[in-house]
From Swiss-Prot:
The keyword DNA repair applies. Residues 81-175 form the Toprim domain. This is Recombination protein RecR. GO terms for biological process: DNA recombination; DNA repair. The lineage of its organism: Bacteria, Bacillati, Bacillota, Clostridia, Eubacteriales. Pfam families: RecR_C (PF21175), RecR_HhH (PF21176), RecR_ZnF (PF02132), Toprim_4 (PF13662). Belongs to the RecR family. Keywords: DNA damage, DNA recombination, DNA repair, Metal-binding, Zinc, Zinc-finger. It comes from Clostridium perfringens (strain 13 / Type A). GO terms for molecular function: DNA binding; zinc ion binding. The keyword Metal-binding applies. It comes from the Bacteria.
């Protein structure tokens, strides 16, 4: 893109690194930002820097937080005997929109994927097992219905079985190969209601 100054090309390149942002979208975002008033651009940049500097992972569940433990883990009104296992922090946001689940969460930060060289030791399964105490009665596995999500669900079921914890899987309704983030609230609610033992 030799017709753009180097600074614009660099900004387009950086935006294009974001998920679901192609070259055209990156170009549109860049041009939009360049047309904003300087104070709005500075506010945007400061918000990015502040979020990156203050947001961390909850030491209990692995969710994004600015306090430790996070607001969900430290909420006395949450059910402590049920944990919903998800792949990423964004999945907690999706589940919370449904307003059907009042337990705790556990974020794996990935799935088991031998093809990508990712085994159980590379995601937060050890931390999940460590959370199994006399209080936890059920673990709902809400990984995405992909090959990796299913493999991860089966592994979790196998590893928790000796610990006398009921392990369930969210029900059909989420399409195979789908992503929880894109499921509507009714579908996700029905999937939670119809979960099955694995």
């Amino acid at each position: 893109m030799e017709f753009y100054p180097v600074a614009i090309e660099k900004l387009i390149e950086e935006f294009a690194k974001l998920p679901s942002i192609g070259k055209k979208s990156a170009q549109r975002l860049t041009l939009h930002i360049l047309n904003l008033p300087k104070d709005e651009v500075e506010e945007f940049a400061n918000a990015l820097v502040k979020a990156r500097g203050t947001i961390k992972y909850c030491s209990v569940c692995g969710n994004f937080t600015d306090t430790d433990p996070c607001a969900i883990c430290s909420n006395p009104n949450r059910e402590k005997d049920i944990i919903c296992v998800v792949e990423q922090p964004k999945d907690i946001m999706t589940m919370e929109k449904v307003k059907e689940f009042n337990g705790l969460y556990h974020v794996l930060h990935g799935t088991i994927s031998p093809m990508q060289g990712r085994g159980p030791q590379d995601i937060r399964i050890r931390e999940l097992v460590a959370r199994m105490s006399g209080d936890v009665k059920e673990v709902i596995v809400a990984t995405n219905p992909t090959i990796e999500g299913e493999a991860t669900a089966m592994y979790i079921s196998k590893i928790l079985k000796p610990l006398d914890v009921k392990v369930t899987r969210i029900a059909a309704g989420i399409p195979v190969g789908g992503d929880l983030e894109y499921a509507d609230e009714v579908t996700l609610s029905k999937a939670l209601e119809g979960r099955t033992v694995i």
